[in-house]
Regions:
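Short, hydrophobic/aliphatic alpha-helical segments
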Residues: 3-21
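Polytopic transmembrane helical bundles with strong interfacial aromatic enrichment
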Residues: 3-6, 121, 168-169
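Conserved phosphate/anionic-ligand binding catalytic regions in large, soluble enzymes, centered on
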Residues: 17-40, 144-162
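Phosphate-handling active-site elements
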Residues: 38-58
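A structural signal for well-ordered alpha-helices, especially hydrophobic packing surfaces
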Residues: 42, 70-77, 84, 116-123, ...
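A structural-propensity feature for long, helix-poor, extended segments
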Residues: 51-89, 189
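Amphipathic alpha-helical interface segments
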Residues: 80, 84-153
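Preference for long, well-ordered alpha-helical segments
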Residues: 129, 144-203
Length: 208
């Protein structure tokens, strides 16, 4: 069964158990999925309201993008665990001969690279989600303004959590060019996303 098909209670219980997965990456994805879901909810509460008619087209676009990102971030909950499982599987590979050990080392490097790409992709989606959320600020139902603030907070937590998962996987990668590339790109996403989340939060504080 996929993690996304578990109830909230079941997910929390397996997350809090001694099972090797899910872990922080899946939790970060869930946080981000919750964030963009709140943005989508605010759009639902705005569309069709006469008071916000002038923003109807813009909010409809935000709604569509939120729905797409919601689906992607929900999928990331399981993708992160699947990436972790690839790394775990390497430990079950034979290590009796030198050939075995070489194959094991190569497999581990490939698995760690894939495990890096998963949370990095999540970071890309989260930055897009924050940019989408910002478009709704000041143009959506004011009764749900606080929900946009909570959306930004959840997205920021997801972004920072995904970054930590990028870093921990990069720490085992020997390919220096790969490490430098993903560290540089990841730091850029982190800086832009955190700044945007803080900006949204401060804007919401002015109206609640």
């Amino acid at each position: 069964m996929k993690l996304v098909d578990l109830s909230l209670t079941e997910f929390a219980q397996v997350l809090g158990s001694d099972a090797p997965a899910p872990g922080g990456g899946s939790a970060a994805a869930l946080s981000a999925a919750n964030g963009i879901s709140l943005t989508k909810m605010v759009c639902e509460l705005t569309l069709g309201k006469k008071k916000y008619a002038e923003f109807e087209a813009e909010i409809a676009q935000v709604h569509a993008e939120s729905a797409r990102l919601q689906e992607s971030l929900l999928a990331a909950i399981d993708k992160d665990t699947e990436a972790f499982n690839l790394v775990s599987a390497v430990f079950d590979m034979p290590k009796e001969t030198e050939e075995d050990k070489d194959a094991r080392r190569e497999a581990m490097q490939q698995a760690l690279k894939e495990a890096t790409k998963s949370p990095y992709g999540m970071m890309e989606d989260i930055l897009a989600a924050l940019q989408t959320t910002q478009k709704a600020v000041g143009k959506s139902n004011t009764n749900a303004a606080s929900d946009l603030g909570v959306a930004a907070l959840n997205l920021k937590a997801g972004l920072q959590g995904a970054w930590l998962n990028v870093l921990i996987n990069l720490s085992g990668v020997k390919d220096e060019a790969f490490v430098a590339d993903y560290r540089s790109k990841g730091e850029d996403l982190l800086q832009k996303g955190c700044a945007l989340a803080d900006e949204i939060y401060q804007e919401i504080l002015k109206v609640v």
